Design a protein with these regions (language model features):
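Periplasmic polypeptide-binding modules associated with outer-membrane biogenesis and secretion
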Residues: 1-121, 153-154, 158, 423-424
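C-terminal outer-membrane beta-barrel translocator/porin domains of Gram-negative envelope proteins
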Residues: 25, 31, 37-40, 121-125, ...
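Outer-membrane beta-barrel pore domains and translocons
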Residues: 61, 92-94, 107, 119-123, ...
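Repeated loop/turn-to-beta-strand initiation elements of outer-membrane beta-barrel proteins
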Residues: 84-87, 111-114, 140-148, 182-189, ...
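Hydrophobic, lipid-facing positions within transmembrane beta-strands of outer-membrane proteins
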Residues: 100, 130-134, 171-177, 202, ...
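Transmembrane beta-strands of outer-membrane beta-barrel proteins
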Residues: 114-116, 146-150, 200-206, 223, ...
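Outer-membrane beta-barrel "beta-signal"
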Residues: 533-537, 564-578
Length: 578
C-alpha cells in the first residue's frame, strides 16, 4: 500500500452571522434578522446597535479566504469597543470542508457601571496623599458602541516641603465628562488611512479642576479632542487635534509669601530705603521686629518704582528687580493655551511579566499657531506689552518636542537593570516670550533626580534662587539596579543625572541659560538607594538620594559636598519611576 496525503483545502466564509446581545438560554426561534452588507445580524426585541457599528468590528468578509489574522483582529476590535464581553466565535465547515458558517456571539456588558476608587497618591507638590474618585460609565450611548464616562475626583495630601506654604495639606477637586467613539470622528472617511484593525478611537473631553496647594491656588478648565490608533500591538499613535486649557490663579497677591527666596532678594534691594521715612509706605514690621517690604502692595509698588526710574538703584540691582517682576507677572498671570500635539509610542513588552523590553515616546506640540493666523481676520485686543488677548487673556504661542526612552534588561533571579533618558525643549515665539508654568520643565523629585526635591534643581548652575525653579529645556538620564530582598520587599541602587535650562526666552541670568556644550558641565548627578514593597496593585517606594555632583557649588565643592544622611533627600513614591 502507499501513503496518500490529502491536499490542503482553502476555506471561505459562506455565511457570517452576528448574534447581538446573545443569550445562551434564549430560543433561536424568537430571534429577528437584519441583513447588512452580507452580514446576518440576529437579535431579539429591538436591535440596540447600528448595523454599521457591528460590521466595522468584524474582519471576516463573505466569500473571502479564512485567515487567522482576521480572527485575531476581530477579537481585538470587539474587545476594544468596551461594549461587549469577550466574544465567542465558532466556524462550522460544510460537507466539502471548503465553506464556513461563521458565527460571532456578542454578549453585552452592563449598560451602566459605577466605579469607586481609593488611591494612595504622590506628586511634585504633595509628599503623600489619598485620592477618591467616582465614575459612571454609560455604554452604547448613541447605538454605535460609544462610551460616556462622567467622573468626579478629590484628593488631600501632605505638602512635600513645609516651607512652601503656611498650609500643611493640599487639596484638589475636579470632574470630567469624557465620550469615546470607536472610530475616527471627522467629516471625511479615514478608513483607507486608518483601517478598523488599528483600533481607531476618538475622544472628546471637558474637565475642570480646583487646586489648593502652595498658596497661589489654581482653577483650570480644559477641553480635548483627540484621536488614537494602534497600527500594531506594539505601536500607538495619538493626535490631540485640539487641547484647550485655561488656568486661573486664584490668589496672585500671595506670590511673595509663596516664593520666599524671590521676596528675600527683592527685600535685599530695598534695604537702603528702609531708614528713609519718605518710603515708609513700602514697609512693615514683621513678628520679629524686622522692617520688611509689605506684601503684596509694598513689594509691588517698590518694584514698579524701581523699574520706572522713580527709585534709583545700580544696574545690577535694576536687573535683579526686573527679573523678579517678570517672573512674578509670568507666574501670576492667567494662561490660555490652544495646542495641537502628536505622540508616537512603541513598547516591546510582551506581557506583564516581561522584564526585558524597551519603550520610546516621541511628542510634538504646537500652541497658538492657529490663533496667530487669525490676527488679520479677528480684531484682537492687545495689552500694554503688545500681546494679543483672547477673552482678556494673552494666548500662549510656542513649539515643543520631547523624546523619552526606557530600556529594561533582565539579568536573572528577578534582577533588572533599568535605564531612562529624556530630552525636551519648548520654544516660545510670536505672542509669547516664555513658556506657561503648566507646560514648562522642572528637575528633582521622586520620579526624576532623587537627590534634589522637586523644583529645587537648576536652572543651570543657579542655586535654587526661585523656590520653584522651572525652565524650557530639560535633559535627564537615570540608571537603576533593582533586586529582590525577601518576599515582596525589593531594593534598588540608582544614579540620576540631568538639569533644566532656559533657552530662546526672556531669561537674562547667564548661569541659567543653555549656551552650548559647555553647559553640559552643569548636569547634576545624584546617587542613592531605595526600598520597595510590592502590593501587587501598586508598589510603595522609599528612596534616599545624595548630591554627588552639584553644579550650583564652586570648584571642588561640587563633588560629594554634604554626602551624608543629614543632607540626604528622602523620597516617597508610588510605583516605579520608570
Amino acid at each position: 500500500s502507499s501513503d496518500s496525503i490529502n491536499p490542503y483545502k482553502v476555506a471561505r466564509h459562506k455565511e457570517i452571522n452576528i448574534y447581538a446581545d446573545y443569550d445562551i438560554h434564549g430560543g433561536a426561534d424568537t430571534l429577528q434578522l437584519e441583513t447588512y452588507e452580507n452580514y446576518n445580524i440576529y437579535y431579539s426585541g429591538k436591535l440596540r446597535y447600528r448595523p454599521k457599528a457591528l460590521a466595522d468590528a468584524i474582519f471576516f468578509e463573505k466569500d473571502s479566504i479564512y485567515r487567522d489574522l482576521d480572527r485575531i483582529r476581530t477579537y481585538r476590535q470587539i474587545t476594544n469597543l468596551n461594549t461587549f464581553k469577550y466574544p465567542n466565535i465558532d466556524f462550522i465547515a460544510d460537507s466539502t470542508q471548503t465553506g464556513l458558517e461563521t458565527n460571532i456571539y456578542l454578549a453585552a456588558k452592563s449598560k451602566y457601571s459605577l466605579n469607586l476608587n481609593f488611591d494612595v497618591t504622590h506628586s511634585n507638590i504633595q509628599q503623600i496623599g489619598t485620592a477618591f474618585s467616582a465614575s459612571v460609565i454609560t455604554r452604547n450611548v448613541f447605538g454605535g458602541a460609544e462610551t460616556l464616562n462622567i467622573s468626579a475626583r478629590g484628593s488631600i495630601g501632605l505638602l512635600s516641603d513645609a516651607s512652601l506654604s503656611d498650609e500643611t495639606f493640599t487639596s484638589e477637586l475636579g470632574g470630567d465628562v469624557n465620550i469615546t467613539f470607536p472610530r475616527i470622528w471627522l467629516p471625511f472617511n479615514t478608513e483607507s488611512i486608518i483601517p478598523y484593525y488599528m483600533l481607531p478611537q476618538s475622544r472628546l473631553l471637558v474637565g475642570t479642576n480646583f487646586q489648593r496647594n502652595i498658596g497661589l491656588d489654581k482653577r483650570s478648565l480644559n477641553s480635548i479632542l483627540s484621536y488614537n490608533w494602534s497600527p500594531t500591538t506594539r505601536l500607538k499613535n495619538n493626535i490631540e487635534l485640539l487641547n484647550v486649557e485655561f488656568v486661573r490663579n486664584v490668589n496672585p497677591d500671595n506670590f511673595y509669601n509663596v516664593y520666599g527666596n524671590t521676596f528675600s532678594n527683592l527685600d535685599d534691594v530695598a534695604e537702603p530705603f528702609k531708614d528713609d521715612s519718605q518710603y515708609a509706605s513700602y514697609f512693615e514690621e514683621d513678628d520679629d521686629g524686622n522692617i520688611i517690604l509689605q506684601i503684596p502692595d509694598g513689594a509691588n509698588d517698590f518694584a514698579n518704582d524701581v523699574l520706572d526710574g522713580t527709585l534709583s538703584v545700580d544696574d545690577e540691582q535694576y536687573d535683579e528687580v526686573n527679573s523678579i517682576e517678570e517672573r512674578r507677572q509670568r507666574l501670576t498671570e492667567n494662561n490660555l493655551i490652544f495646542a495641537t500635539n502628536f505622540a508616537h509610542t512603541k513598547n516591546s513588552k510582551s506581557g506583564i511579566n516581561d522584564l526585558d523590553f524597551y519603550q520610546y515616546r516621541i511628542k510634538l506640540e504646537s500652541a497658538g499657531g492657529m490663533l496667530s493666523l487669525l490676527t488679520n481676520v479677528i480684531p484682537y485686543n492687545q495689552n500694554d506689552s503688545g500681546q494679543y488677548l483672547v477673552f482678556g487673556v494673552p494666548y500662549s504661542q510656542y513649539v515643543k518636542t520631547e523624546f523619552d526612552y526606557i530600556r529594561h534588561w533582565s539579568i536573572g533571579g528577578g534582577q533588572v537593570i533599568a535605564f531612562r533618558s529624556f530630552s525636551g525643549i519648548a520654544i516660545p515665539y510670536g505672542n509669547s516670550n516664555n513658556i506657561p508654568f503648566v507646560r514648562s520643565y522642572f528637575a528633582g523629585g521622586s520620579n526624576d533626580n532623587r537627590a534634589w526635591n522637586a523644583y529645587e534643581l537648576g536652572p543651570g548652575s543657579t542655586d535654587n534662587i526661585n523656590d520653584f525653579n522651572e525652565a524650557n529645556l530639560k535633559l535627564a538620564l537615570n540608571l537603576e539596579y533593582r533586586f529582590p530582598i525577601a518576599g515582596n520587599v525589593k531594593g534598588a541602587l540608582f544614579a540620576d543625572a540631568g538639569n533644566i535650562w532656559n533657552v530662546f526666552d526672556n531669561e537674562t541670568n547667564p548661569d541659567a541659560i543653555f549656551s552650548g556644550f559647555s553647559s553640559l558641565g552643569d548636569i547634576a548627578l545624584g546617587t542613592g538607594a531605595g526600598l520597595r514593597y510590592d502590593f501587587t496593585y501598586f508598589v510603595f517606594r522609599l528612596d534616599v538620594g545624595f548630591k554627588t555632583f552639584n553644579p550650583a557649588k564652586d570648584g571642588s565643592d561640587r563633588w560629594f559636598d554634604g554626602y551624608n544622611f543629614k543632607r540626604a533627600v528622602f523620597n516617597i513614591g508610588i510605583n516605579y519611576p520608570f
